[in-house]
């Protein structure tokens, strides 16, 4: 069964959307294999976003993801990566369609509520990054 990593970012937690978002995944019959609330430190944030380290928004992104607690989870299911990304919507809240998580709840260009792995390869890397205890 395919796995993916999902991060409910600080604005999801602050706005009390965690239960609603998790409920959407459960209604699609995805299994929550692992879930935890944590604070992401700068080192972990820089590692996670290293692919955009040369972009002008990098420091703002790091400040945002480290600004408060996040909920990190591993979901499994049939074609879960593709399905979750479809449920999440476009990266920009303004480009996300109604019915998607970002389309329904997003209101800020930069604070976009949620991260979801974009491929099997990145999912496995991200799962090891945020759940290193599972790698033994």
Curated annotation (Swiss-Prot):
Question: What name has this protein been given in UniProt?
Answer: Nucleoside diphosphate kinase
Q: Write down the HAMAP family for this protein, in alphabetical order.
A: NDP_kinase (MF_00451)
> Which Pfam families does the entry mention?
NDK
Task: Give the taxonomic lineage as stored in the record.
Answer: Bacteria, Bacillati, Bacillota, Clostridia, Eubacteriales
State the UniProt keywords alphabetically.
ATP-binding, Cytoplasm, Kinase, Magnesium, Metal-binding, Nucleotide metabolism, Nucleotide-binding, Phosphoprotein, Transferase
Source domain of life: Bacteria
| Residues binding ATP | 9, 57, 85, 91, 102, 112
Subunit description: Homotetramer.
Q: Which GO terms describe its molecular function?
A: ATP binding; metal ion binding; nucleoside diphosphate kinase activity
Q: Which gene encodes it?
A: ndk
Q: Its biological function? A: Major role in the synthesis of nucleoside triphosphates other than ATP. The ATP gamma phosphate is transferred to the NDP beta phosphate via a ping-pong mechanism, using a phosphorylated active-site intermediate.
User: Which coenzyme or cofactor does it need?
Assistant: Mg(2+)
Q: Which residues form the active site?
A: 115 (pros-phosphohistidine intermediate)
InterPro entries hit by this protein: NDK-like_dom, NDK-like_dom_sf, Nucleoside_diP_kinase
One example of a Gene Ontology biological process annotation: UTP biosynthetic process
Q: Where in the cell is it found?
A: Cytoplasm
Top enzyme category: transferase
Q: Which reaction does it catalyse?
A: a 2'-deoxyribonucleoside 5'-diphosphate + ATP = a 2'-deoxyribonucleoside 5'-triphosphate + ADP; a ribonucleoside 5'-diphosphate + ATP = a ribonucleoside 5'-triphosphate + ADP
């Amino acid at each position: 069964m395919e796995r993916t990593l999902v991060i409910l970012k600080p604005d999801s937690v602050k706005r009390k959307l965690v239960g609603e978002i998790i409920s959407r995944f459960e209604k699609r019959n995805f299994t929550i294999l692992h879930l935890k609330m944590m604070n992401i430190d700068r080192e972990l944030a820089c590692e996670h976003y290293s692919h955009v380290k040369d972009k002008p928004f990098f420091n703002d992104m790091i400040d945002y993801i480290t600004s408060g607690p996040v909920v990190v989870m591993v979901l499994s299911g049939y074609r879960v990566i593709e399905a979750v990304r479809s449920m999440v919507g476009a990266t920009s809240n303004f480009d996300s369609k109604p019915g998607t998580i970002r389309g329904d709840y997003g209101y800020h260009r930069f604070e976009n509520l949620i991260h979801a792995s974009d491929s099997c390869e990145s999912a496995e890397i991200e799962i090891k990054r945020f759940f290193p205890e599972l790698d033994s």
